Amino acid sequence: MVGVYSSDCNVIGSIPDYGVLLDYICEKYKAKEDSGFVFRTQKTVERFDKAVESGILRFENNQHESLFISSISGDDFSLAEKMIILFWQMIYANKLFEKLTRNVFMPAMYQGRITIDAQEGLSYLRQLQQEEPESLPWAESTLSTTASKYLSILKKLGLADGSIKKTILHPTVSDKLFVYFIRWALTAEPKNRTLENPYLYFGFYDRDSLIAKLKKIDHILFWDINQLGYDIIIELKDYE
């Protein structure tokens, strides 16, 4: 039984350098042969490439793909900002990563928690397995590995630090990165241009802070805001 959820997190979590990972992705799009990684076997190459393709390089449409690739291949964002962009992209591309982030990491961050550990991820995965046994037919050892690798990913993305119990790191979202985030969320889920867009939850802002940020005069070049009571519709502008 294959199940609905993939184990891509386990492969991606084993990659030592995410800066090189971004270079590898850019090189794939430039059709270069030198990946920057050294693999022991062809099987390892195939496993790695498959995890990148299915766990990162999945897109809603061509606009979404172009937005991501241009952001990681250009010089507009720092490496730390590109890590956050990669974090958001993995949320879209990998269903299990999205569920762990939505139900474990983001609640801890929004609650102002200082630390997070693999046991929390494992507890959630066990619960998910009970709710969807056919979708997650994994052994306990695989669940445990996934919970651990998930925290490894967060650490390499700059969102956590430490060894066993990870310290939660709150990223700095610059205005430029915020503009990218809004464009990404509305491009990844184009049918929902309201604050109920499911991807807006991952922006590190509570609802009131998000509204205030959206309405900043500096952002009028990028979108229009239409408000009816407590409902807000975001209309992206073509500014490039």
What annotation goes with each model-predicted range?
Residues M1-P107, I116:
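Eukaryotic partner-binding/assembly regions in large regulatory complexes
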Residues K43-F48, L96, E140-K156, G203-K216:
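Short amphipathic alpha-helical interaction segments
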Residues Y110:
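Acyl-donor binding region in acyl/amide transferases
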Residues K155-D231, L236-D238:
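Accessory, usually C-terminal, subdomains that scaffold auxiliary metal cofactors
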Residues P107, Q127-E131, I153-A160:
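Amphipathic alpha-helical interaction surfaces
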Residues E132-T142:
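Short helix/loop segment immediately N-terminal to the Walker
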Residues T115-P133:
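DNA-recognition alpha helix
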